[in-house]
Amino acid sequence: SGKSIHLLLYGILSMQFLFMEMQWINSGCIHSGEYFHGPFEVTDYDVPFMLVKSIGHTRHLDERVENFAKKFTEDLLVLDQKDLDLSTVADEAKPYVAAILTGVVIRHFVEAIAFERGHSLDVRRYMWQMQY
């Protein structure tokens, strides 16, 4: 979850783009506020989760998701924006800057996945390969 709906929507689209389109990993992006409206039913020991804990006013939602998910999966990666050094950023701008930096961290994470899997981020199965 996060401060700006524009950055949130961009983040959701970016994660879908990186994991699904570029790595062919079946995934979904769920706002913490929506998690308990059904998506939490897929939480299981063999289902990996990546949680971005915001520093904004929705952090309590992220913490609620984290507390629940920890009980039912051992494959939970938490990217906590509190771990970012934002000491030189104005307080009112921190949630926005944190959202942007989180996108950079996730991009590097996906690049590492691509390297480990031997699946370049440039490879496409259908896109640009044929008429569709």
Label every model-predicted segment.
Residues 1-132:
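A SIS-like phosphosugar-recognition module
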